[in-house]
Structures are given as structure tokens and as C-alpha cells.
């Protein structure tokens, strides 16, 4: 790998070819330090849901209906009630309206199949069951086809406010509600098409960074107030207040600056960008795709 082809992700030099490897399946692997690693019952439950969701994804069956346990419901209630208090103060209007329209409450864990049916009627998006964090190409291929991958397992009960990996609380309370917005849905679909069409690893990284600072950690200006729409922020009781604190550098969303900015997913995000609207974000992505000459139009 020569200097010209070297790119940096998460502060490390990586081979750009790893960005465009063929689609693959997720793996069930709890990292060292995972709260549920030593809990045999939790691991067994994760294994069962992993196998079920993988089968439904590969066979195109849609999200399975899950009979959640009382412990999983307790964790959902504790985490979602804390988040809802913060959402009412800091989440974007579009997010809050969509959350209400989808009937998401802090009392019962919603069934993703039912939400998927509602989304299809609104924006032609649907939810794809994901057994775990999917590889780049698998994930982007799903959203290119108007499907958003979502997990259906719940984080470990010892840390209801924390998860080292995307779980249902992150996906359902972070990613799913904005899918009710047409501009947001079209934005996601275009990201998926562009990322799966290009064979240039640097371009894939550009689209990942664009997604990170919008879909995952995006802020939006609403009548002069900075509100949150990024899933990574909205699903974390720590990130919500931190994102609006004086410790974070917040500037208007400028695409060239965004795609040149690295990030570390293991740390609180101290660099964020603010958009004026989802329509603006969609236009910025369209211009980026054309500038990079990715043949998706």
C-alpha cells in the first residue's frame, strides 16, 4: 500500500480495499469488557436472537415478532424513560412527531414488524432484521434498497444506560423515527446506492463520514435553537447533554470539512456539525455524489 492510497479511519492508517470488500454476515462476538460477557443466560439469549434474525434477514422475512422477557422490558422501560425526558427538551421536532406517530412508548418494547409496516406506508422504507452490526457493504446494500437494518436484542441489564454495540434501544429510539421523513429517507437511500456503487475505498470513507456526522451525530437548527436528530446522540443519556455543552465544537455543516474529519466511535464526540434542514442535507449529498462521479443518477 503506497502513500497515495493510504487513508485514515478512527485515527489509524488502513488499507482502502477493506472498505469495498464483498458483503458478509455479522458475527456474534462480545468484546472484552462487554457487560454481558460473563452472564451465561444473556449470552444464550443473544445467540438465539442472533440465529433468528439472521434467518429472517437472509430469507427476506422481515423483522420477527419477539416475545420479550420481563427483564428485557424492565431495561427498555428504564432506558427509554430516561431518554424520553431528554428528547422532549433537546430532540428535533421532526424526530418527536415521528416518534409519536410510530406509537413508541417507554412502557412496552415495540415490535419492529409493526413499525416497518407503518414506514412502508409513509416513505416506502422498511426495516431489515439484523443479527448484529453488519459489514459496510451489507449495511449499505440494504439501505440502497430502502431497507434499514435494525437489531432486536436488548443491552445487558447491569448497564441500561450503556451499550458497546448498536442494540434495539439505539436503533428504535435513534434511527427509526427519522425514517418517517421523506428527505431523510431519500438521503439514506442515496448514501446506500453511492457506497455500494463505488469501488473506491476513499469514496466509501467519505460517505461513512458524511453519515456519521449526520445520521449518527447530526444536529439541526430549528428557529435559532440547536436540536438533535442523530441516532448516536438520541440513544445516549450521556451524549445528549454533552453534544450541546461548551465542550463540543459545533459549526455549520460544510461537506468538504465533514468528509475530511476523522472520528473515534469509542469516545464522546466533541466535534459536531449543524444542518439547517434535511432538504439541505439531501442536496449536499447529491452534489457530493456528482462531484465524485459515482454513477447512481
Predicted features, each with a name:
Residues 153-283:
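A contiguous, surface-oriented mixed alpha/beta subdomain in the mid-to-C-terminal portion of proteins
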Residues 1-179, 258, 270-297:
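The feature captures two recurrent sequence modes
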Amino acid at each position: 500500500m503506497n502513500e497515495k492510497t493510504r487513508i485514515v479511519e478512527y485515527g489509524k492508517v488502513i488499507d482502502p480495499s477493506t472498505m469495498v470488500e464483498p458483503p458478509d454476515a455479522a458475527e456474534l462476538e462480545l468484546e472484552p469488557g462487554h457487560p454481558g460477557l460473563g452472564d451465561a443466560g444473556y449470552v444464550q439469549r443473544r445467540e438465539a436472537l442472533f440465529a433468528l434474525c439472521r434467518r429472517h434477514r437472509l430469507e427476506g422475512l422481515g423483522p420477527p415478532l419477539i416475545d420479550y422477557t420481563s427483564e428485557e422490558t424492565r431495561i427498555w422501560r428504564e432506558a427509554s424513560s430516561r431518554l424520553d425526558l431528554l428528547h422532549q427538551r433537546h430532540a428535533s421536532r421532526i424526530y418527536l412527531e415521528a416518534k409519536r406517530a410510530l406509537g413508541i412508548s417507554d412502557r412496552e418494547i415495540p415490535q419492529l414488524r409493526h413499525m416497518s409496516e407503518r414506514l412502508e406506508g409513509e416513505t416506502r422504507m422498511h426495516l431489515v432484521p439484523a443479527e448484529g452490526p453488519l459489514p459496510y457493504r451489507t449495511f449499505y446494500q440494504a439501505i440502497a434498497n430502502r431497507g434499514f437494518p435494525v437489531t432486536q436484542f436488548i443491552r445487558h441489564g447491569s448497564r441500561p444506560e450503556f451499550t458497546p454495540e448498536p442494540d434495539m434501544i439505539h436503533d428504535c429510539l435513534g434511527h427509526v423515527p427519522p425514517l418517517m421523513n421523506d428527505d431523510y429517507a431519500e438521503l439514506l437511500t442515496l448514501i446506500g446506492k453511492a457506497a455500494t456503487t463505488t469501488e473506491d475505498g476513499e469514496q466509501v470513507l467519505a460517505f461513512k463520514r458524511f453519515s456519521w456526522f449526520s445520521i449518527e451525530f447530526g444536529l439541526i437548527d430549528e428557529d435559532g435553537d440547536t436540536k438533535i436528530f442523530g441516532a448516536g446522540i438520541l440513544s445516549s443519556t450521556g451524549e445528549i447533554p454533552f453534544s450541546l455543552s461548551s465542550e463540543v465544537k459545533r459549526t455549520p455543516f460544510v461537506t468538504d470539512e465533514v468528509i475530511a474529519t476523522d472520528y473515534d466511535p469509542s469516545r464522546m464526540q466533541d466535534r459536531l456539525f449543524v444542518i439547517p434542514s434535511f432538504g439541505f442535507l439531501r442536496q449536499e449529498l447529491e452534489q457530493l455524489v456528482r462531484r465524485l462521479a459515482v454513477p447512481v443518477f
